Structure formats: C-alpha cells, structure tokens
Amino acid sequence: MAGNTFGQLFTVTTFGESHGAGLGCIIDGCPPGLELSEADIQFDLDRRKPGTSRHVTQRREADQVEILSGVFEGKTTGTPIALLIRNTDQRSKDYGNIATSFRPGHADYTYWHKYGTRDYRGGGRSSARETAARVAAGAVAKKWLKEKFGTEITAYVTQVGEKEIRFEGCEHISQNPFFAANHSQIAELENYMDSVRKSLDSVGAKLHIEAANVPVGLGEPVFDRLDAEIAYAMMGINAVKGVEIGAGFDSVTQRGSEHGDELTPQGFLSNHSGGILGGISTGQDIRVNIAIKPTSSIATPRRSIDINGNPIELATHGRHDPCVGLRSAPIAEAMLALVLIDHALRHRAQNADVQVNTPDITLSNK
C-alpha cells in the first residue's frame, strides 16, 4: 500500500517531486472555523526553504504557498484543504550522471528495486524537498493547537558533527543560520561548516524538539501510544536515524529511583519521561531528540554500481546541504504538531465527556 498519507482524523496526503512542477498536500479533517491565511503557513515555509545561507543548498525556491480549497472568507470550512507550492529553480542537468547509477546512501537503489523505475532528478519523491508540504500542513496544525490549548512547539539544533552546541536561550534560534539556541558559538560553527564544505564532505546533526502546554490525556494505548506515534513521525523525516523521548538512551544508566518522575500536589518533580507515561501525555512538556545522518550527496568520489551491476565510481554534483539537519527544525516541529492535533481530535472523539476529581497537577506550574 502507498504510504503518502499521515494521521487518522487529521490526515495529510502529500504529493510532488523535487524537480516536478510543484508539490503540496491535501489536509482532511481540519476543524472548521480556524482563521487561516497563506501568511500563517508562509512563516514556517520561509524558515525551511533553501538558499537562506551559505551553509545550506543554494537552490533558490520562494516556496510560496497557495491555498486552493478548504478556506472561505478567511476561515477553514471543514472540507479538504489543498495547499500547493510550485517549483521554480530546478536544475535537472546536474543529475544526468546518475540516471543509470545509484548514489551511496540515497534511496536510488531501493526505489529502483521497489518500483522498477525512478525519477532520478534530485531524488524525485525521496528528496527532502517533499518536506515543504509537511511544513505547510504542520503550520495549520500548530495554529489550531495554539488557539485551542496554547501549545507552543520549538525545535533547535544541539549538535552539528562533533560540535556540541550549548543551550543559551530560545530567543537565539531565529537569529542564526543554524537554528541554534546559542549566541556565543555561532562564529565557531560558521568556520566549522565552511571547512566541511571545502572538504567536499558532509556532517550530521542532533535536534531537540519540545512542545509546551500539551493537555493531559493524549495518546491511544496500546498500539497508538503517543510516544510511539511521535517516534514514527520523526523517523519518517528524511535522514533521521534515531529518536529519543525524555531521558531516552540515558535511561539505561539511571536508577529507578532517579528516572521515575515523582508527583506532588504542586506538580511533577522531574520530566525524565518526556511528558508521556503509558503512552499518554502527562501535561508536562513533551521532549524529543532526533539524530540526522550526514547528507549523502557529496562531491567526494565513492564506489557504487550502475543499473546493470557494474562497478563505478560516483561523485554527486549539484546544489546540496553539507548538513541537512540545519533545515530540519521546522520539519520536526511540523511532524510533532501533526501527531498532537491528530491525537487531540481522537481524544475528543472518544473521551470528551470524561471527568475525574484528581486535579491536573501540571496546571499548578503554568
């Protein structure tokens, strides 16, 4: 079965390829009455778009979104919302040398074996360019979540290659090309990325994603646990190779007396769970880390094969990110938002009338 649709009640189906006429998505299940304009969506697309600094791909795309349906007189109608982003700066000639060969680390080999054909221009459907449609859909989800619950979703880069980035404040994220919550290390990171590009190589990255003001109760045990759905969503982002929620892999070295978040009438005393217990949100901040592999498109020659199985040496030419993780923060935010809105609607559908006498202790800290 095709895997182009995400979600159950708030569904997003994306379409398009890297070098096609355009790409976009169909959102179905968005509640009616949400004030929505193209400007609401454009803000996050501008954060993700290419060509914004020398440290990312120099492909120049405006990524201007068009709302084709589902919005009338400035508000959502409850009918499918169609969003379109046209491609304007394709340079397909850069990919002629891979029409009959497979780039190491890319989906070329697997797409060829699965479908028997592939759009080799910029990776086609497997390109990270497809994530522009996810960011557009995520912007809609983020706006609804903020208006409904006050939910705020923030992502930032915590490591680039071997360079760990100290947290100095979220106010710095929008002020540098690295989506870093840091000011003092930016010059160091600039020099580091310049050296990576000059070496004709690439590096990976680590990101932290956090959602504040998430209501208690989201998640559908046992198979659609909130943490399971978040991990699924994050692993669906191009180049993501690892996901941690809460303490993550550090949980291995913790004792139970440390890891278990104690409760008091004034709130939880820690958040090693990452805001999720038993697959259900606790009302605390949801905390996620993701690891992103080095960009596979590099100009350094590497061994591969052609479609006939013959050995070749291949160097990838064109415009590529030396660290694809640098533009991943808006994508990760979008995917977390899509999970949360879907589960908020699912929770409302089944449990809207549930009432308990126990107070929501997370509210005392807000």
Curated annotation (Swiss-Prot):
Catalytic activity annotation: 5-O-(1-carboxyvinyl)-3-phosphoshikimate = chorismate + phosphate
Main EC class the enzyme belongs to: lyase
Enzyme Commission number(s) of this protein: 4.2.3.5
Record's keyword terms, sorted: Amino-acid biosynthesis, Aromatic amino acid biosynthesis, FAD, Flavoprotein, FMN, Lyase, NADP
UniProt GO molecular function: chorismate synthase activity; FMN binding
Family: Belongs to the chorismate synthase family.
Assembly mode: Homotetramer.
Cited function: This reaction introduces a second double bond into the aromatic ring system.
Protein name, per record: Chorismate synthase
Chain's gene name: aroC
